[in-house]
Amino acid sequence: MATYAVGDLQGCLEPLKCLLQQVAFDPALDRLWLVGDLVNRGPQSLETLRFLYGMRESLVCVLGNHDLHLLAAAKNIERLKKSDTLREILEAPDCAELMEWLRQQKLMHYDEQREVAMVHAGIPPQWSLRKALKYAEEVETALRDDNLLPPFLDGMYGNEPAKWDSDLKGVTRLRVITNYFTRMRFCTAEGKLDLKSKEGLDTAPPGYKPWFQHKERKTRGLRIIFGHWAALEGNVHEPGICALDTGCVWGGSLTLMNVDSGERLSCKCDEHGAALPTVAPLITESSPVSAPR
């Protein structure tokens, strides 16, 4: 039995199938972790969701910002953007079934045996593991509650407040939690977010750093798997931090990592997110087997 984690799919099903075939993935024995952003921008969002739903018993999934956007669109809370490729899902006869499954997924996964956490974007430096799990559960509860879901989806959009405060209440509180877990890249040591900068490690605004580079980060010693940040190309140069979004939907590649060994496979993609006939081992500095103790 093997456990793999895969980067942002964004509706790119071919590369995923290519990688699963390469490792002889067996849904009856193996497990696949998904870092979120299962859909949108790529050519096969509906097919991707259906494929994953069909093997749902073998999956662990955390939600990304695009997945939450889909849930909002399905509830007619948010209109689709011109760049969205979600219309086919919304018009599908099994849309309600797929959305019901999607809203049951996590915002954060923690494997206690492996001491590994998985989130879409990151964990802010001021939160401990215990607090991060607690706050993630608050959003997960809203997603799964028929009465709480509409106001949450309606209020989750926005960049403010930019910083966590334990006294925050209601939808405002859930918005900040959601932004940390699904949109964060750069922040201050106190957790103040900059949600405009989206490029590489050296493009941080003054006073900001990538969330994982803060020396006083309270989750140091914890191995964290995340996606979301394609500009990193999987390289973070930080022990215990595993970045898996390698931009498959932008003509980069889709990356699959063995969670236990840290070994990675990469499937190159064209500019439309389709798989190219190349699957190669990928070794980076950001894929240690375990975090430092």
From Swiss-Prot:
| Known EC number | 3.6.1.41
**Broad class of enzyme this protein falls into:** hydrolase
What Pfam families does the record point to?
Metallophos
| Superkingdom field | Bacteria
Q: Which UniProt keywords apply?
A: Hydrolase
The yes or no answer to whether the keyword RNA-binding is present is: no
Its recorded reaction(s) are: P(1),P(4)-bis(5'-adenosyl) tetraphosphate + H2O = 2 ADP + 2 H(+)
UniProt key word Hydrolase: yes
Any one GO molecular-function label of the UniProt entry:
bis(5'-nucleosyl)-tetraphosphatase (symmetrical) activity
InterPro entries, sorted = ApaH (IPR004617), Calcineurin-like_PHP_ApaH (IPR004843), Metallo-depent_PP-like (IPR029052)
The entry sums up its family as follows:
Belongs to the Ap4A hydrolase family.
> What task does this protein carry out?
Hydrolyzes diadenosine 5',5'''-P1,P4-tetraphosphate to yield ADP.
Protein name as annotated: Bis(5'-nucleosyl)-tetraphosphatase, symmetrical
Q: Which source organism?
A: Pseudomonas fluorescens (strain Pf0-1)
